Amino acid sequence: MKHITIIGAGLAGTLCGLYLARRGYEVELFESRPDIRNSPTDYGRSINLALSCRGITALKAMNLLSEVNKIMVPMRARAIHEANGEIHYQPFGRHIDEYINAISRSDLNALLLNKAKLCPNIKLHFNMKLHSLDIHNKKIKFENKNGDFVEASYHRLIGADGAPSHVRDMLKNEGIVSASRDFLSHGYKELSISKKHTKGMAREHLHLWPRDSFMLLGNPNPDDSITGSLFLANEGKDSFAELNNEEKLHLFFKTQFPDAYAAMPNLVQEFFGNPTGHLSTIQCSPWYYKDECLLIGDAAHGIIPFFGQGMNSAFEDCRILDELLDEYQDDWSRVNSVFYEHRKVNTDAIAKMSMDNYHEIHSDIRNPKFILQKQIERELMLRYPEHYVSMHVLVMFTNTPYAKAMAIGELQSGLLEQICFPITDIKELNWQEVEKLLSLYDKKLAKII
Protein backbone atom coordinates (compact mmCIF):
# COMPACT_ATOMS: atom_id res chain seq x y z
CA MET A 1 0.00 0.00 0.00
CA LYS A 2 1.41 3.38 -1.01
CA HIS A 3 -0.44 5.68 1.34
CA ILE A 4 1.27 8.25 3.55
CA THR A 5 -0.18 10.58 6.18
CA ILE A 6 1.77 13.77 6.89
CA ILE A 7 1.11 15.82 10.01
CA GLY A 8 1.91 19.46 9.22
CA ALA A 9 1.28 21.32 5.97
CA GLY A 10 3.93 23.96 6.49
CA LEU A 11 7.02 24.25 4.33
CA ALA A 12 8.63 20.87 5.08
CA GLY A 13 5.42 18.84 5.17
CA THR A 14 4.05 20.23 1.92
CA LEU A 15 7.30 19.87 -0.02
CA CYS A 16 7.71 16.34 1.33
CA GLY A 17 4.16 15.56 0.20
CA LEU A 18 4.96 16.80 -3.30
CA TYR A 19 8.07 14.61 -3.47
CA LEU A 20 6.14 11.54 -2.31
CA ALA A 21 3.20 12.21 -4.61
CA ARG A 22 5.64 12.31 -7.52
CA ARG A 23 6.71 8.80 -6.51
CA GLY A 24 3.10 7.60 -6.79
CA TYR A 25 2.13 7.69 -3.12
CA GLU A 26 -1.37 8.69 -2.04
CA VAL A 27 -0.66 11.54 0.39
CA GLU A 28 -2.89 13.12 3.02
CA LEU A 29 -1.68 16.32 4.68
CA PHE A 30 -3.23 17.40 7.99
CA GLU A 31 -2.64 20.94 9.28
CA SER A 32 -3.78 22.23 12.68
CA ARG A 33 -4.10 25.83 11.51
CA PRO A 34 -6.43 27.37 8.91
CA ASP A 35 -5.35 27.41 5.29
CA ILE A 36 -2.65 30.08 5.16
CA ARG A 37 -3.81 31.06 1.66
CA ASN A 38 -7.07 32.35 3.14
CA SER A 39 -5.63 33.93 6.28
CA PRO A 40 -4.38 37.52 6.61
CA THR A 41 -1.90 36.57 9.33
CA ASP A 42 1.15 34.35 9.57
CA TYR A 43 0.30 33.23 13.10
CA GLY A 44 3.11 35.34 14.56
CA ARG A 45 5.80 33.22 12.98
CA SER A 46 8.93 34.49 11.26
CA ILE A 47 7.71 36.26 8.14
CA ASN A 48 10.92 36.33 6.11
CA LEU A 49 13.29 33.43 5.67
CA ALA A 50 16.64 32.97 3.92
CA LEU A 51 16.66 30.57 0.99
CA SER A 52 20.10 29.33 -0.04
CA CYS A 53 21.72 26.49 -1.97
CA ARG A 54 20.31 23.50 -0.08
CA GLY A 55 16.74 24.72 -0.27
CA ILE A 56 17.17 25.82 -3.87
CA THR A 57 18.51 22.37 -4.81
CA ALA A 58 15.46 20.69 -3.28
CA LEU A 59 13.03 23.05 -5.03
CA LYS A 60 14.86 22.73 -8.34
CA ALA A 61 14.55 18.94 -8.18
CA MET A 62 10.76 19.41 -8.09
CA ASN A 63 10.81 21.98 -10.94
CA LEU A 64 9.56 24.68 -8.58
CA LEU A 65 12.45 27.13 -8.71
CA SER A 66 11.25 29.24 -11.63
CA GLU A 67 8.08 30.15 -9.72
CA VAL A 68 9.87 30.60 -6.40
CA ASN A 69 12.31 33.02 -8.07
CA LYS A 70 9.41 35.43 -8.62
CA ILE A 71 8.76 35.87 -4.89
CA MET A 72 12.27 36.17 -3.47
CA VAL A 73 14.78 39.01 -3.15
CA PRO A 74 18.58 38.57 -3.37
CA MET A 75 20.68 39.44 -0.31
CA ARG A 76 24.23 39.91 -1.56
CA ALA A 77 25.88 41.13 1.64
CA ARG A 78 25.41 42.10 5.25
CA ALA A 79 24.93 45.82 5.90
CA ILE A 80 26.04 46.38 9.49
CA HIS A 81 24.58 49.52 11.07
CA GLU A 82 26.55 50.92 14.00
CA ALA A 83 24.93 53.04 16.71
CA ASN A 84 27.04 56.03 15.58
CA GLY A 85 25.53 55.87 12.09
CA GLU A 86 28.43 54.14 10.32
CA ILE A 87 27.56 51.26 7.99
CA HIS A 88 29.96 48.44 7.09
CA TYR A 89 29.42 45.84 4.37
CA GLN A 90 30.39 42.16 4.41
CA PRO A 91 29.66 40.10 1.26
CA PHE A 92 28.19 36.64 1.82
CA GLY A 93 29.87 34.91 -1.09
CA ARG A 94 33.07 34.91 -3.10
CA HIS A 95 31.58 36.88 -5.99
CA ILE A 96 28.43 38.75 -7.00
CA ASP A 97 26.60 35.59 -8.10
CA GLU A 98 26.84 34.02 -4.65
CA TYR A 99 24.02 35.39 -2.55
CA ILE A 100 21.20 34.23 -0.32
CA ASN A 101 17.56 35.11 -0.86
CA ALA A 102 14.91 36.66 1.35
CA ILE A 103 11.50 35.03 0.93
CA SER A 104 8.17 35.33 2.68
CA ARG A 105 7.27 32.19 4.65
CA SER A 106 3.57 32.62 3.90
CA ASP A 107 4.12 33.30 0.17
CA LEU A 108 6.32 30.22 -0.20
CA ASN A 109 3.94 28.06 1.83
CA ALA A 110 1.03 29.25 -0.32
CA LEU A 111 2.95 28.43 -3.50
CA LEU A 112 3.67 24.89 -2.28
CA LEU A 113 0.06 24.39 -1.17
CA ASN A 114 -1.20 25.54 -4.56
CA LYS A 115 1.05 22.94 -6.18
CA ALA A 116 -0.24 20.29 -3.78
CA LYS A 117 -3.85 21.21 -4.55
CA LEU A 118 -3.21 20.59 -8.25
CA CYS A 119 -1.80 17.14 -7.49
CA PRO A 120 -4.53 14.45 -7.84
CA ASN A 121 -2.95 12.14 -5.26
CA ILE A 122 -2.65 14.74 -2.48
CA LYS A 123 -5.50 15.58 -0.11
CA LEU A 124 -5.27 18.66 2.12
CA HIS A 125 -7.04 18.97 5.49
CA PHE A 126 -6.93 22.19 7.53
CA ASN A 127 -8.06 23.07 11.07
CA MET A 128 -7.25 19.51 12.11
CA LYS A 129 -5.32 19.52 15.38
CA LEU A 130 -3.65 16.26 16.32
CA HIS A 131 -5.25 15.06 19.56
CA SER A 132 -3.82 11.57 20.03
CA LEU A 133 -1.67 9.00 18.30
CA ASP A 134 -1.91 5.25 18.81
CA ILE A 135 1.42 4.27 17.31
CA HIS A 136 0.92 0.53 17.89
CA ASN A 137 -2.46 0.31 16.16
CA LYS A 138 -1.76 3.06 13.61
CA LYS A 139 -4.69 5.20 14.71
CA ILE A 140 -4.82 8.99 14.90
CA LYS A 141 -7.44 11.32 16.31
CA PHE A 142 -7.89 14.96 15.32
CA GLU A 143 -9.93 17.80 16.74
CA ASN A 144 -11.51 19.98 14.07
CA LYS A 145 -12.41 23.68 14.29
CA ASN A 146 -15.86 22.83 15.67
CA GLY A 147 -14.36 20.91 18.57
CA ASP A 148 -15.46 17.55 17.14
CA PHE A 149 -13.10 14.58 17.09
CA VAL A 150 -12.23 12.77 13.89
CA GLU A 151 -10.51 9.38 13.93
CA ALA A 152 -8.48 7.90 11.12
CA SER A 153 -6.09 5.06 10.38
CA TYR A 154 -2.75 5.45 8.66
CA HIS A 155 -0.36 3.17 6.86
CA ARG A 156 2.77 5.28 7.24
CA LEU A 157 3.10 8.54 9.19
CA ILE A 158 5.46 11.51 8.76
CA GLY A 159 5.66 14.15 11.47
CA ALA A 160 6.44 17.54 9.91
CA ASP A 161 4.65 19.63 12.51
CA GLY A 162 7.48 21.96 13.46
CA ALA A 163 9.49 22.65 16.60
CA PRO A 164 6.49 22.24 18.97
CA SER A 165 5.74 18.87 17.28
CA HIS A 166 2.85 16.91 18.76
CA VAL A 167 3.98 13.81 16.87
CA ARG A 168 7.41 14.00 18.51
CA ASP A 169 5.87 14.59 21.94
CA MET A 170 3.58 11.58 21.55
CA LEU A 171 6.47 9.36 20.46
CA LYS A 172 8.39 10.62 23.48
CA ASN A 173 5.49 9.78 25.79
CA GLU A 174 5.53 6.24 24.40
CA GLY A 175 9.26 5.94 25.14
CA ILE A 176 10.04 5.58 21.44
CA VAL A 177 12.21 8.69 21.16
CA SER A 178 14.23 10.80 23.55
CA ALA A 179 13.66 14.49 22.92
CA SER A 180 14.24 17.92 24.43
CA ARG A 181 13.59 21.51 23.43
CA ASP A 182 16.07 24.04 24.77
CA PHE A 183 14.99 27.68 24.68
CA LEU A 184 17.27 30.69 24.38
CA SER A 185 16.83 33.44 26.94
CA HIS A 186 16.11 35.72 23.97
CA GLY A 187 12.93 35.97 21.93
CA TYR A 188 12.06 37.84 18.75
CA LYS A 189 9.38 40.15 17.43
CA GLU A 190 8.55 41.03 13.83
CA LEU A 191 8.49 44.76 13.01
CA SER A 192 8.14 46.54 9.67
CA ILE A 193 10.47 49.15 8.20
CA SER A 194 8.53 51.30 5.74
CA LYS A 195 9.58 51.42 2.09
CA LYS A 196 8.91 55.17 2.12
CA HIS A 197 11.83 55.62 4.51
CA THR A 198 14.39 53.06 3.27
CA LYS A 199 16.03 55.13 0.51
CA GLY A 200 19.25 55.39 2.51
CA MET A 201 19.39 51.63 3.07
CA ALA A 202 21.13 49.47 0.49
CA ARG A 203 18.82 47.23 -1.52
CA GLU A 204 19.48 43.50 -1.77
CA HIS A 205 21.24 43.43 1.60
CA LEU A 206 20.61 41.75 4.92
CA HIS A 207 20.60 44.65 7.37
CA LEU A 208 21.99 44.11 10.86
CA TRP A 209 21.98 46.41 13.86
CA PRO A 210 24.12 44.36 16.29
CA ARG A 211 24.43 45.61 19.85
CA ASP A 212 26.00 44.03 22.93
CA SER A 213 23.12 41.83 24.08
CA PHE A 214 20.44 42.40 21.44
CA MET A 215 20.04 42.92 17.72
CA LEU A 216 17.71 44.16 15.00
CA LEU A 217 17.79 42.27 11.72
CA GLY A 218 16.16 43.39 8.47
CA ASN A 219 15.24 41.27 5.45
CA PRO A 220 14.33 43.00 2.16
CA ASN A 221 10.91 42.53 0.55
CA PRO A 222 10.02 42.70 -3.17
CA ASP A 223 8.29 46.08 -2.64
CA ASP A 224 11.51 47.60 -1.17
CA SER A 225 10.18 47.58 2.38
CA ILE A 226 12.14 45.70 5.03
CA THR A 227 10.87 43.13 7.49
CA GLY A 228 12.63 43.64 10.80
CA SER A 229 13.16 41.07 13.52
CA LEU A 230 14.10 42.37 16.96
CA PHE A 231 16.06 39.81 19.00
CA LEU A 232 15.93 40.76 22.66
CA ALA A 233 16.23 39.14 26.08
CA ASN A 234 12.91 38.07 27.55
CA GLU A 235 13.75 39.38 31.03
CA GLY A 236 16.21 41.77 32.68
CA LYS A 237 17.97 44.84 31.31
CA ASP A 238 17.19 45.75 27.69
CA SER A 239 14.46 43.11 27.47
CA PHE A 240 10.91 42.66 26.26
CA ALA A 241 9.81 42.77 29.88
CA GLU A 242 11.56 46.11 30.43
CA LEU A 243 10.12 47.81 27.34
CA ASN A 244 6.64 47.90 28.82
CA ASN A 245 5.43 51.34 27.72
CA GLU A 246 5.61 53.66 24.72
CA GLU A 247 8.07 56.10 26.29
CA LYS A 248 10.64 53.39 27.03
CA LEU A 249 10.15 51.87 23.58
CA HIS A 250 10.70 55.16 21.73
CA LEU A 251 13.80 55.99 23.78
CA PHE A 252 15.26 52.51 23.25
CA PHE A 253 14.85 52.55 19.46
CA LYS A 254 15.85 56.18 19.05
CA THR A 255 19.06 55.52 21.00
CA GLN A 256 19.98 52.07 19.71
CA PHE A 257 18.66 52.00 16.11
CA PRO A 258 18.29 55.66 15.05
CA ASP A 259 18.19 55.10 11.28
CA ALA A 260 15.75 52.19 11.54
CA TYR A 261 13.64 54.08 14.09
CA ALA A 262 13.10 56.91 11.60
CA ALA A 263 11.63 54.37 9.16
CA MET A 264 9.24 52.64 11.59
CA PRO A 265 6.00 54.66 11.76
CA ASN A 266 4.05 51.66 13.11
CA LEU A 267 6.57 50.73 15.79
CA VAL A 268 4.28 51.12 18.80
CA GLN A 269 1.34 49.23 17.31
CA GLU A 270 3.51 46.39 16.06
CA PHE A 271 5.71 46.07 19.13
CA PHE A 272 2.79 45.82 21.53
CA GLY A 273 0.48 44.04 19.08
CA ASN A 274 2.69 41.38 17.51
CA PRO A 275 3.45 38.20 19.45
CA THR A 276 6.92 37.49 20.85
CA GLY A 277 8.39 34.42 19.20
CA HIS A 278 10.50 31.76 20.89
CA LEU A 279 13.99 30.63 19.86
CA SER A 280 14.83 27.00 20.53
CA THR A 281 16.95 24.01 19.55
CA ILE A 282 15.42 20.54 19.27
CA GLN A 283 17.36 17.42 20.18
CA CYS A 284 15.69 14.14 19.27
CA SER A 285 16.85 10.55 18.95
CA PRO A 286 15.91 8.54 16.99
CA TRP A 287 13.61 10.18 14.44
CA TYR A 288 11.67 7.09 13.44
CA TYR A 289 9.67 4.09 14.60
CA LYS A 290 10.15 0.93 12.55
CA ASP A 291 9.07 1.58 8.94
CA GLU A 292 5.87 3.23 10.14
CA CYS A 293 6.72 6.71 11.40
CA LEU A 294 9.37 9.35 10.61
CA LEU A 295 10.08 12.88 11.82
CA ILE A 296 11.49 15.52 9.46
CA GLY A 297 12.39 19.21 9.54
CA ASP A 298 11.99 21.22 12.73
CA ALA A 299 10.03 18.38 14.33
CA ALA A 300 13.25 16.33 14.30
CA HIS A 301 15.99 18.96 14.46
CA GLY A 302 14.72 22.52 14.93
CA ILE A 303 17.46 25.14 15.28
CA ILE A 304 17.81 28.82 16.06
CA PRO A 305 17.70 31.03 12.93
CA PHE A 306 21.14 32.64 13.03
CA PHE A 307 22.64 30.74 10.11
CA GLY A 308 19.49 30.90 8.01
CA GLN A 309 19.43 27.11 7.65
CA GLY A 310 16.20 25.97 9.31
CA MET A 311 14.12 25.88 6.13
CA ASN A 312 17.12 24.88 4.02
CA SER A 313 17.94 21.85 6.16
CA ALA A 314 14.25 20.84 6.20
CA PHE A 315 14.08 21.03 2.40
CA GLU A 316 17.34 19.08 2.25
CA ASP A 317 15.59 16.39 4.34
CA CYS A 318 12.95 16.08 1.61
CA ARG A 319 15.52 15.76 -1.16
CA ILE A 320 17.68 13.23 0.65
CA LEU A 321 14.65 11.17 1.71
CA ASP A 322 13.63 10.99 -1.94
CA GLU A 323 17.14 9.93 -2.98
CA LEU A 324 17.19 7.19 -0.33
CA LEU A 325 13.79 5.93 -1.49
CA ASP A 326 15.37 5.59 -4.93
CA GLU A 327 18.44 3.84 -3.56
CA TYR A 328 16.50 1.38 -1.40
CA GLN A 329 13.54 0.94 -3.76
CA ASP A 330 11.01 2.38 -1.30
CA ASP A 331 11.96 -0.08 1.45
CA TRP A 332 11.06 2.16 4.39
CA SER A 333 12.46 -0.27 6.96
CA ARG A 334 15.90 0.54 5.56
CA VAL A 335 15.23 4.11 4.47
CA ASN A 336 14.15 5.38 7.89
CA SER A 337 17.24 4.13 9.72
CA VAL A 338 19.69 5.22 7.01
CA PHE A 339 18.00 8.62 6.74
CA TYR A 340 18.36 9.15 10.48
CA GLU A 341 22.00 8.00 10.59
CA HIS A 342 22.90 10.18 7.61
CA ARG A 343 21.05 13.30 8.71
CA LYS A 344 21.47 13.28 12.49
CA VAL A 345 25.22 13.99 12.50
CA ASN A 346 24.68 16.78 9.99
CA THR A 347 21.73 18.45 11.69
CA ASP A 348 23.63 18.31 15.00
CA ALA A 349 26.44 20.13 13.21
CA ILE A 350 24.22 22.91 11.84
CA ALA A 351 22.63 23.30 15.28
CA LYS A 352 26.09 23.98 16.74
CA MET A 353 27.10 26.26 13.87
CA SER A 354 23.85 28.21 14.27
CA MET A 355 24.58 28.77 17.94
CA ASP A 356 28.14 29.85 17.09
CA ASN A 357 26.77 32.24 14.47
CA TYR A 358 24.37 33.65 17.06
CA HIS A 359 27.37 34.76 19.12
CA GLU A 360 29.20 35.95 16.00
CA ILE A 361 26.35 38.18 14.86
CA HIS A 362 25.71 39.56 18.34
CA SER A 363 29.25 40.54 19.27
CA ASP A 364 32.11 39.23 17.11
CA ILE A 365 30.87 40.96 13.97
CA ARG A 366 32.13 44.36 15.23
CA ASN A 367 35.35 43.06 16.79
CA PRO A 368 38.46 44.38 14.92
CA LYS A 369 40.12 40.96 15.08
CA PHE A 370 37.02 39.28 13.65
CA ILE A 371 36.79 41.88 10.86
CA LEU A 372 40.46 41.32 10.02
CA GLN A 373 39.95 37.55 9.89
CA LYS A 374 37.01 38.00 7.52
CA GLN A 375 39.10 40.26 5.27
CA ILE A 376 41.90 37.71 5.18
CA GLU A 377 39.47 34.85 4.60
CA ARG A 378 37.95 36.63 1.63
CA GLU A 379 41.42 37.31 0.21
CA LEU A 380 42.36 33.64 0.67
CA MET A 381 39.30 32.60 -1.35
CA LEU A 382 40.17 35.06 -4.13
CA ARG A 383 43.88 34.18 -4.29
CA TYR A 384 43.62 30.43 -3.67
CA PRO A 385 40.14 29.33 -4.80
CA GLU A 386 41.24 25.70 -5.23
CA HIS A 387 42.61 25.56 -1.68
CA TYR A 388 40.35 27.65 0.51
CA VAL A 389 36.54 27.82 0.65
CA SER A 390 35.17 29.25 3.88
CA MET A 391 32.82 27.34 6.16
CA HIS A 392 30.11 29.96 5.57
CA VAL A 393 30.37 29.49 1.81
CA LEU A 394 30.25 25.69 2.20
CA VAL A 395 27.10 25.96 4.32
CA MET A 396 25.24 28.55 2.26
CA PHE A 397 26.38 28.01 -1.32
CA THR A 398 27.09 24.27 -1.58
CA ASN A 399 25.45 21.00 -0.55
CA THR A 400 28.53 19.91 1.40
CA PRO A 401 27.32 17.87 4.41
CA TYR A 402 27.03 20.14 7.42
CA ALA A 403 29.30 17.95 9.55
CA LYS A 404 32.08 18.16 6.97
CA ALA A 405 31.62 21.93 6.65
CA MET A 406 31.89 22.28 10.42
CA ALA A 407 35.07 20.18 10.58
CA ILE A 408 36.60 22.29 7.80
CA GLY A 409 35.53 25.44 9.64
CA GLU A 410 37.30 24.33 12.81
CA LEU A 411 40.47 23.76 10.79
CA GLN A 412 40.10 27.18 9.17
CA SER A 413 39.66 28.86 12.53
CA GLY A 414 43.07 27.59 13.59
CA LEU A 415 44.64 28.72 10.32
CA LEU A 416 43.20 32.24 10.60
CA GLU A 417 44.41 32.52 14.19
CA GLN A 418 47.94 31.69 13.02
CA ILE A 419 47.80 34.14 10.12
CA CYS A 420 46.37 36.99 12.20
CA PHE A 421 48.44 36.54 15.34
CA PRO A 422 51.25 39.02 14.57
CA ILE A 423 49.29 41.64 12.58
CA THR A 424 46.53 44.25 12.92
CA ASP A 425 46.07 45.12 9.23
CA ILE A 426 45.82 42.93 6.12
CA LYS A 427 48.50 45.10 4.47
CA GLU A 428 51.02 43.70 6.96
CA LEU A 429 50.63 40.15 5.66
CA ASN A 430 53.63 38.24 4.36
CA TRP A 431 52.00 36.12 1.67
CA GLN A 432 54.98 33.78 1.41
CA GLU A 433 54.47 32.87 5.07
CA VAL A 434 50.73 32.54 4.46
CA GLU A 435 51.39 30.07 1.64
CA LYS A 436 53.53 27.93 3.96
CA LEU A 437 50.67 27.84 6.49
CA LEU A 438 48.23 27.10 3.67
CA SER A 439 50.34 24.13 2.58
CA LEU A 440 50.08 22.65 6.08
CA TYR A 441 46.35 23.40 6.07
CA ASP A 442 45.97 21.48 2.78
CA LYS A 443 47.50 18.35 4.33
CA LYS A 444 45.11 18.49 7.28
CA LEU A 445 42.17 19.23 4.98
CA ALA A 446 42.92 16.14 2.89
CA LYS A 447 42.23 13.96 5.94
CA ILE A 448 38.77 15.51 6.35
CA ILE A 449 37.79 15.39 2.69
Swiss-Prot record:
GO biological processes: anthranilate metabolic process; kynurenine metabolic process; L-tryptophan catabolic process; NAD biosynthetic process; quinolinate biosynthetic process
Family under the similarity heading: Belongs to the aromatic-ring hydroxylase family. KMO subfamily.
MF terms (GO), sorted A to Z: FAD binding; kynurenine 3-monooxygenase activity
Pathway(s) annotated for this protein in UniProt: Cofactor biosynthesis; NAD(+) biosynthesis; quinolinate from L-kynurenine: step 1/3
Function: Catalyzes the hydroxylation of L-kynurenine (L-Kyn) to form 3-hydroxy-L-kynurenine (L-3OHKyn). Required for synthesis of quinolinic acid.
Chain coiled-coil ranges: none
Keyword Flavoprotein: yes
Main enzyme class: oxidoreductase
Species of the source: Legionella pneumophila (strain Lens)
Gene this protein is translated from: kmo
Protein name: Kynurenine 3-monooxygenase
Pfam families referenced in this protein's UniProt entry, alphabetically: FAD_binding_3
Co-factor(s): FAD
Catalytic activity: L-kynurenine + NADPH + O2 + H(+) = 3-hydroxy-L-kynurenine + NADP(+) + H2O
